[in-house]
Amino acid sequence: MQVSLESTSSIERRMTIGVPATQVNSEVEKRLQKTARTVRMNGFRPGKVPMSVVKKRYGEGVRQEVIGEMMRDAYVEALQKEDLNPAGYPKFEPKKIEDGEDLEFIATFEIYPEVSIGDLSSISVEKEDFEIVDADVDSMIEKLRQQSSEWKDSEDAAAEGDRLTIDFKGMIDGEAFEGGSAQNAQIVIGSQRMIPGFEDGLVGLKAGDEKTLDLTFPEDYHAENLKGKLAQFEVKVSKVERSELPEINDEFFAQYGVQEGGEEAFKVEIRKNMEREARFAIANKVKQQVVDQLLGLSEFEVPSALVDSEVNRMREDAVQRFGGGQMKASQLPAELFKDQAVKRVKTGLIFAQVVKDNNLEATEEQIEAKIRELASSYQEPEQVVSWYMSNPEQKAQMQSVVLEDVVVDFVADKAKIETKSVSYEDAVKPRTAPAEQAEDGEQSAE
């Protein structure tokens, strides 16, 4: 077998491979003989079909089958010979060959890049330190009450925090406009879902009331044709509801897994959960800083095959989480995910290099500790631990998570650390605000 290798970029390789004709013809002949022993054809006894007839009917198909297999086998052998690590599948370009000529083809493929990481001591990380005070616990309990609240019909005039069910119709210069009307829209006063003045205009209304609101769309409104426009909204209220909070009692505590010990035990459990949430949020912010700075220290070309694979994973994940079974992953534009996919692939390659360079690993003790940390938020933690430890696939996923943590801790130990004291509320905030997402609102007045 003859092999010649050409580098067409830092990560793309073009390999020309030649396989002797005798090797190809020998395998073709062997398979045709095997076919002749089993093939059934009208006018011939089984196993007695002349080879000339077998070749005429099956020769070309068998030859193409052999060529395909030999290209794959020769490609793998050539990779081993050249000590190459491909990233993704190759593109084969067979040259036209006639009977008796050597098989020659070109395999174009990408290899994993060489990842060189800069000085880890140049990385600087801000790490937050927090303290949970009693007021934080009380505030969390109030949030839990809000989450467990129920809407009850109210005959009172609508006030801040009430939910109204309304019909409304928007007009500009006496003409209705697209997205300016809705039926049975539910609006919570104070939610700031609607344009300025809309929710304030609902205060004091009761079920059955009607009102016209004269409002102005903001100059920075997302719809270009509505910016700064004066509009009238005819509103009819069909229902006013008020939020009813649950009492703080044993029944409320039981909803959150506290069966005994009363309010004191409940507050202890809430504080533990808050501490776990804050530690997780802080660790995630440290990881984000480490990742961002590692990316800045490492410049290399990313194999498109790996990016495409990550895009497909992200598409599938998006469909599972948001698609509701109504769409296919292929319907989502790849460009929506490409930038994030590139970042994920680069991060994975950098982390893998740090692991390799420093002989890092995730120990059994670390994996079990991570599983127990995760399980502690469930009502039956030991069952969760047992499930992970007895499920090889899930345990392997957890091993990957732990190994990422090991890399982050290793890099952070080399980095300059600045500790900053923050409140619980600041501790659980993300490092950067997520990008605003366009909403499929019920109306343009939102």
UniProtKB/Swiss-Prot annotation:
GO terms for cellular component: cytoplasm. Residues 437-446 have a biased composition (Acidic residues). Residues 161-246 form the PPIase FKBP-type domain. GO terms for biological process: 'de novo' cotranslational protein folding; cell division; chaperone-mediated protein folding; protein transport; protein unfolding. It is an enzyme of class 5 (isomerase). Residues 422-446 are annotated as: Disordered. Keywords: Cell cycle, Cell division, Chaperone, Cytoplasm, Isomerase, Rotamase. Its main location: cytoplasm. The keyword Nucleotide-binding does not apply. It comes from the Bacteria. Consists of 3 domains; the N-terminus binds the ribosome, the middle domain has PPIase activity, while the C-terminus has intrinsic chaperone activity on its own. Involved in protein export. Acts as a chaperone by maintaining the newly synthesized protein in an open conformation. Functions as a peptidyl-prolyl cis-trans isomerase. Belongs to the FKBP-type PPIase family. Tig subfamily. This is Trigger factor. It comes from Hahella chejuensis (strain KCTC 2396). The gene is tig.
